[in-house]
């Protein structure tokens, strides 16, 4: 298994280099496949197939990818960080370096710049990056800010799904500015403005290297200054089970002491034991930057500092964000504050309250009813997504403790979240997408996995199977549909024997004829980011 030291490196720095130890011919083969995919995309501009050449169906078109994804070092790392029943989300992409610079950002919660909730510090999501060629600094490598996964910038009021460190970067066309020195200066200012004590670094690696990153690590695609092609395969993964506590205390060694309280909390969540963290003297003044706010919030949460409740109810986003994370380790105090927050007239405060309820995972009837009300009634899509994610996390935890945990209230909310009439596709995106229905499908997958592992009675799972069957056969969001299919497969393998034959029959009838390619309103190449 991945060593404790490697795990701490991931929790602290937000990334881990992996040698998959595949056959020596695989990197070259995957490089050629990537080049062919981009050539095919260029020939099919204007058709959805242009997108499909690069995204979401890669393992079917390129079977050799299974050699990478099933490689023991890759599986071992994913298992240690995300648990044994991790799920490869139905989104993947082949990126190509070009002449443009991206701004620093965290990826959107869902594919194609779709926002869908709040970011958990816990390792519930991860990205696997693979470089099939030697990648040098002049080839446009991915740049990252190590340790940035726990810190963020304000985003409320901005529709774009990515959290951009420089909100004006795209509007000011910095990435295409012919004056390269001005680009570099703006990028350097962005990093310094985000945190004066940190810096960015390029991922320069030998051919065949995989990089496992925390989903929320700040990164960007940089321009290339050579004629050599640089491709990167990207895969999304998510956790579907609660951590199995080993009872072993993990020793910490963080490169930045400001991250120690949060890294210690992540290590405790994974192992069950809290590592010792050196006491740092509390500053006399209020925290002036994100890193200090997060550090102090975790310390205050562990101490049960009631002032975090007032901070959670603040309309100042950065103040509220830090309090929200600090309250995840505050137990009952956090739950009381979260319930208050869900009653707010401010959408950001309601969203923070819903998120916090999911992280704390108390299964009280009042908590379930409150989240169900947000799913059914809240006017803000982000709040509904967050409430659905929270319900999935609560059920996942509670079922791990009690196989007979009452699911009816949660199932009622997920039935609402899966309803295409109530939650139609979001307009204006590259493919049909609904963040609410994606959130619903992920919650269902978490619940199904936990219920199977717990040995929950079949009658309790049956309504979930019904929702999954409907989503798997008729949902227009490919990511919700793919996640639902995974849930049904797990049900079938978990002895829910009536599920699989019915699903096969329904899918066979639905896809007896291949649908025609759908034309796009605008060229696909304008929508594709090059990380």
Regions found by a protein language model. Name each.
Residues 1-119:
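Non-heme Fe(II)-dependent double-stranded beta-helix
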Residues 96, 145-153, 236-242:
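Short edge-strand/loop segments of extracellular domains
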Residues 104-107, 113-115, 138-144, 153-157, ...:
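A short secondary-structure junction signal
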Residues 115-137, 204-205, 237:
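Short, conserved beta-strand element in jelly-roll/cupin
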Residues 139-218:
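Double-stranded beta-helix
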Residues 212, 216-310, 320:
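Non-heme Fe(II)/2-oxoglutarate
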Residues 279-301, 318-333, 350-363, 373, ...:
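Structural detector for internal amphipathic alpha-helices that build alpha-solenoid repeat scaffolds
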Residues 300-313, 331-343, 362-376, 397-427, ...:
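Amphipathic alpha-helical scaffolding segments comprising HEAT/armadillo-like alpha-solenoid repeats
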